[in-house]
Amino acid sequence: TVWCPEVTSVGVIGSFNDWTPVYLTPQGSTGVYSGVIPEAKPGDLYKYRITTAAGETFDKADPYAFWAEVRPGTASRIAQLDGYSWHDGRYQAVRRSTKSPRPMNIYEVHLGSWKQQEQPEDPDYPFLSYRQLAEELVPYAAEMGYTHLELLPVMEHPFDGSWGYQVTGFFAPTSRYGAPHDFMYFVDQAHQHGLGVILDWVPGHFCRDAHGLGRFNGKMLFEGADHPEWGTYKFDFARSEVRGFLISSALYWLSCFHADGIRVDGVTSMLYLNFGLPDWAEKTYNAQGSEENTAAVEFLRQLNDAVHAYAPGAITVAEESSAWPHVTGDTASGGLGFDYKWDMGWMNDTLEYCKTDFPFRSYHHNQLTFSMAYGFSERFILPLSHDEVVHGKLSLMGRMPGDYWRKFAGLRLLAMYQLTHPGGKLSFMSTEYGPFIEWREYESLEWFLLDYPAHRMHRDYVQHLNRLYRDTPALWQDDHSWEGFHWLDADDSAQSILLFRRTGREKTKAVTVLLNFQPNVYSDFRIGVPYPGQYRELFNSDAGPFGGSGKENPGILKAEPIPCHGEKWSVCVRVPPIGGI
């Protein structure tokens, strides 16, 4: 069955009929064509042969195919979806029933380059399979203390260099890594290891390859316009059939593959009619004379309502970089209905600050504090994503000023700042061991760097920090309100120090965080505390086993009746260089 209105005929050609058309029957005036081909079986290749009213004939892959031929082949492949035995019932039940806050520390992964075969039989296919990744990536991420995996698009795509963001198969896990059952096994194993799986999903545009959705019936059908920035087609959100196609795709991944959420790519490009159009003469406007794409807005609300209705416990995340209001607001109140939004402002400000050399940081202190001026206007995730380590932007390590030691110290401090700042967390693969080069999608990560002590110690540091975050409710229970965050000193620009308190539901188990962005050491730094008694240092980024200089605070810190930071009591600590406690 396929939707292909305003054509003369639709036939099915495939390996089961020697690529000779078997014509489908039109279903009234719906534009839908259907038929049954008894000899077709799982694994067979097929396409649609479409003839337009103008007499043009061409072949297309099935928009609704569950599997595809391995690239560079472009045919669809018949898949067997039933028959997989799931073992994630307990995880699924907890996800559906849990309403209380949970930690969110996401490991973002490109499956094709996380790790590759050392000696592949075919150099064009060096990838690990879904099942191999289930045995290697999944336990690694769980052992590292992450709570979720987020996968760059696994939907079928023809070009490796698109990283999966130019899709042809919105219902097909890419055949580069195996069959649909293999991907089910990957998700199943993730759940059995306690990891959620979030899928990057691209409803804003699709690639122009001839076998894909573009000009599917000889003219614009799924698309409404060209995408000027990305060389792709934009979906026509005004068509109910297109909205239904996309929402069905999202629900399919959540139901059939047990995914725990979708991260909607390029939301900003969907919300604005003229996104990426520099020429005023080419711009278009809606009926109210503004640039908002009202059809896309309605689609996003329908999408989020559908996900929350049909996939209880699943989340939706928006990559949205403008100031569009209420992205995570309820649809009934005029919001878009997402559960989370990437905080692109935090990411940009933080990375700009981190690459600033130490003598000049005091003049840019606001880049560290501005995020809290709007920090609870949405439910945010703090992303250090793949987009920040490509196209000449440098790796995170490459941004850090100073010598080798200071670079690692800066990277440790960045990780602590991210994990103690309100909001969910997302880090791209490899940042846990500190590579110096940017990410390259065509080759494996540089795992050999773990043979070097500095990189190995950094990986161990991230593991311990992740576990501290996961096991400390004060760092995530009240992540989206002022109840969980209190500035002790936001204005110490002279010393480039941030001082704040994180609080969960047990107020007496609050955590005080000090972050020093300068290479200076302070031996007697006083911090205000809310209660008398004894305090201890939970974690120190400067600890020797992590590659630090060992400026720690061992033993008991006894509160003294000396007022400080608006509190009646205070403790005196040693502050490490380019470090946090």
Where are these regions (language model features)?
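Soluble or luminal CAZymes and related metallo-dependent hydrolases
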Residues: 129-133, 179-182, 241-246, 291-299, ...
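Carbohydrate-interacting/catalytic domains
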Residues: 1-105, 130-141, 145, 406-408, ...
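Conserved alpha/beta catalytic core and glycan-binding cleft of carbohydrate-active enzymes
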Residues: 258-260, 275-442, 470-527, 531-542, ...
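Substrate-binding/active-site clefts of carbohydrate-active enzymes
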Residues: 91-101, 110-291, 557, 573
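Short, flexible loop/turn elements at secondary-structure junctions
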Residues: 6, 28, 39, 110-115, ...
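Short, contiguous acidic/charged loop-to-helix segments that flank catalytic cores in large enzymes
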Residues: 170, 174-178, 237, 288-292, ...
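Generic recognition of well-ordered alpha-helical segments
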Residues: 135, 185-188, 248, 302, ...
